[in-house]
């Protein structure tokens, strides 16, 4: 997982944080020296509680008549949170608010595809 996280952080200086949860395993890494960063405990609960719930709800809605769910993009005050479902969990990436985040979504997805986490 370290190579995947390294690749995602190297994609752009606008990638603030990467978290990968698969089953009970959660790996988080934050870029050093961030302004407006969340606390480590807050990030942990977001990955264990908030993002899985968000993905469950939006996946169920997407499966009704919207063609499923590819990802969720949340705009918090200090950053964007890009959350993708993967087998047994999610990949969550915080992006700087100045970033044209939509432009980073496809390169992020391509890296996850190379690591066989999304199709």
Which sequence ranges carry the predicted segments?
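Non-catalytic interaction/Regulatory regions outside core domains
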Residues: 1-119
């Amino acid at each position: 997982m370290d190579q995947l996280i390294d690749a995602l952080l190297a994609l752009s200086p606008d990638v603030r944080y990467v978290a990968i949860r698969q089953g009970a395993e959660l790996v988080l890494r934050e870029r050093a020296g961030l302004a407006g960063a969340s606390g480590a405990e807050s990030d942990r609960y977001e990955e264990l509680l908030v993002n899985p719930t968000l993905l469950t709800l939006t996946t169920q809605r997407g499966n009704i008549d919207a063609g499923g769910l590819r990802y969720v993009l949340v705009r918090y005050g200090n950053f964007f949170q890009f959350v993708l479902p993967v087998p047994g969990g999610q990949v969550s990436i915080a992006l700087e608010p100045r970033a044209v985040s939509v432009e980073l979504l496809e390169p992020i997805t391509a890296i996850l595809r190379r690591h066989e986490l999304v199709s």
